[in-house]
Amino acid sequence: MSRSDTEPDHAGERRSLMRVLVFAYACEPDKGSEPGAGWVWSRMLARMGEVWVITRESNREVIEAALPSVPEAGALHFEYVDLPRRARFWKRGARGARVYYVFWQVAALRRARRLSQAISFDLVWHLTWANAWLGGLAPLLPGRFVYGPVGGGVGMDWNFVTVLGIRGAVFEVARALSRAGARFLNPLARLPWRRADLILVQNPETRAWLPARHREKALVFPHIVVEEGAGWMGPRPETPTKNALFVGRLLPWKGVALALRVLVLLPDWTLTIGGDGYDERRLRRLARRLKVEDRVAFLGWLTPDRVHDLMREGSDVLLFPSLHDEGGWVIAEALATGLPVVCLDRGGPPAIGGSGVPCKGVSQTVAALAQAVVTAAGRATGGFPSIHSSSVRLQSILRSRFPALSFAETWSPPMES
């Protein structure tokens, strides 16, 4: 039984506030990427009104453990939905997970329709796994519909295909064909664009990828949000040698091959790589071929605490030359520690706050990245997307788009003792 099945009637002062029904397939506290976005954005919405979140049954334990400790708990209600155990085999691999997700949406839609019979929702919101070429079923519900933050619009710059390796190049060709086909042939992709009253997109490329008639209702709003108390700002300790840090999956499109080439141009620097993935073997071979293997440390998968330690004390720059990241949770985490970020001027990282280097072919881009790394080292970072600042901005957008709705007063974070 879900939390909302057992709770008493809500306090009278919240009854007049907006009621939001959220589809958040991924939603887990203390996580990055999509699960973290589902949790933090649900909390942000609960600062403005009453929120019902439909998520996976597998998320129940961690959500119920964390919920009592968050100040928005009284306005958050979770409904847990999953497919029968015999259908779980679909989740094997990335493609299988997408198939499973489509069927999960059918089950979530059934639960949402039952909820809508008992509760009049002001907004229906497709929150996580919002992919512009995958789509969703949430807009089939009555009422105003908000879609996003949506990703999926960042394409490949084919000038960089030579740094991907054969497997990476094949993946990019398949991805490009899938994106093109889904845009024109997938009715589930077109449905949210058409029905949305507001579309939030993670980056400018995704807004440009939408059909022109839908772009005027799309705003750039990255889904990356850092919780209060997650910043480690302050004077950064001196490091004995200059070190660039990369954190992420070791996949060809993540751009680690570019980072290794940058190291060739920076003989006084080292590179620490945190993450694992199938591209690691190729990257180790490349480091040997470039004669930089003695200045590269492959650390494998790292715990969040270890990542934060490296950001705070062991690095001078986060070098994140991803070729088509929609967001990049690690960008916000680095900025929160005061670590400067150097990235390509593509997709989500520069929208979050990274220093974006224009893409002008491999050699020119590598040289520009090297110069940006040297310039960024020791430079103070700007702000980062906290849950408070993002909540204030989001409420301003919603008030403008939906003036008839009733919102709670702008939230102020509790003072730390």
Positions of predicted regions on the chain:
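Aromatic "clamp/platform" in nucleotide-sugar-dependent glycosyltransferases that forms part
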Residues: 323
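Membrane-proximal helix-turn-helix segments that form the acceptor-binding/catalytic region
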Residues: 40-43, 110, 153, 168-199
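Donor nucleotide-sugar binding/catalytic pocket of nucleotide-sugar-dependent glycosyltransferases
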Residues: 77-79, 147, 178-233, 411
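Short hydrophobic beta-strand element within catalytic cores of glycosyltransferases
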Residues: 317, 331, 340-343
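A conserved mid-protein helix/loop that constitutes part of the nucleotide-sugar donor-binding site
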Residues: 36, 242-265, 278-284
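N-terminal subdomain of nucleotide-sugar transferases
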Residues: 2-74, 416
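Nucleotide-activated donor-binding/catalytic signature segment of Leloir-type glycosyltransferases, i.e.
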Residues: 284-302, 306
